[in-house]
Structure formats: C-alpha cells, structure tokens
C-alpha cells in the first residue's frame, strides 16, 4: 500500500524515469514487524539472491541473503515498540538504499523480525496454504492480517529546481491496538 507515481504526460514520465535511473529518489516505508529490535536505528547490509538459484524453493520468486547475491542495504529506525495480546511488535521506518526485489521483507526476516502478515518471509508454508485454500481462520491467527504490513509512506524526487514529495499515512487496517 502507499504512494505510487503515475504520470499523464510523456515528458513527465521521462523526467521521473531519468531521476530514478540516476538514483535521485528516496522511498521511505513504514512497517509493522514481529519482535523488538535491540537497536533503535540500524543498517542491514546483506546481499540478496533468488533462493532457487542455490537450493530448492517451492516459491520461485523467494529471495534470500547469500554471499553471492547482489548488494543490498536497508536503513531502519524504530518508531514505536508495541505490546499486543502478550506479543512484542515494532513499528519501523525503513529506507532501502538499494532497490532489490523483496529487499525490505528479506532483510527484516533475516534479522529475526519478519513483517506482520508476510506469507512468504514469515513462514513460507503460509503462502503455500493460502494458494491452496485461500484466506482461512488459521492463517489469520498466524499472520494477523491478510496482507503484509508494509506501506510506502513517502516518495521524494530530487530535481535541480527542487524536491517533489508525496506522502500517505499508514493504513488504519494494518495498525495494532495496544
């Protein structure tokens, strides 16, 4: 969920595409994860590879941290630590420095704090069961939400004449009440 950019004119699309190619953009995400990270701010620097390239994976698109993968860096800041139904959760602000497929999801799972509702990187059997049976009460108990609690909260383009930014608040449907 969150901010997505769509242009109506070819020239605008060209300018935004060039800015993205030149890495003159910044995307900030908000997410709800399991557990409480030990640090309030930290950087995850771990290369990513499609899991099926090095071992069997029933989910073709699943990525993993692997020494032979592409460089991937994610900056993270804890916004809030939450106690809910006897469990610990954290609300994070996450900024990918690189832009690898599933980067945020893989990195957070890798450090032991998977995104709430993530069917692939929390427990991949959830995804396989979801494909077979759809959304069930058992999946709801395990995942809490029918989708991952990852939200594109802000998108900024840095142009010579100034920055352009768009923001979207975290969805109410993905919040936990304390």
What function would you assign to each model-found segment?
Residues 1-178:
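RNA pseudouridine synthases
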């Amino acid at each position: 969920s969150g901010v997505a950019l769509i242009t109506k004119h070819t020239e605008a699309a060209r300018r935004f595409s060039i800015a993205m190619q030149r890495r003159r953009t910044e995307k900030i995400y908000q997410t709800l994860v399991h557990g409480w990270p030990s640090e309030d701010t930290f950087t995850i620097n771990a290369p990513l590879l499609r899991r099926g390239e090095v071992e069997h994976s029933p989910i073709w698109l699943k990525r993993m941290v692997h020494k032979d993968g592409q460089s991937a860096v994610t900056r993270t800041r804890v916004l809030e630590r939450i106690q809910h139904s006897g469990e610990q959760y954290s609300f994070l602000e996450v900024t990918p420095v690189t832009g690898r497929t599933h980067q945020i999801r893989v990195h957070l799972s890798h450090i032991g704090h998977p995104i709430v509702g993530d069917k692939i990187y929390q427990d991949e059997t959830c995804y396989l069961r979801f494909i077979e049976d759809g959304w069930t009460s058992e999946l709801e108990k395990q995942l809490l939400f029918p989708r991952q609690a990852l939200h594109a909260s802000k998108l900024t383009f840095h142009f010579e004449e100034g920055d352009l930014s768009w923001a979207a608040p975290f969805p109410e449907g993905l919040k936990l009440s304390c």
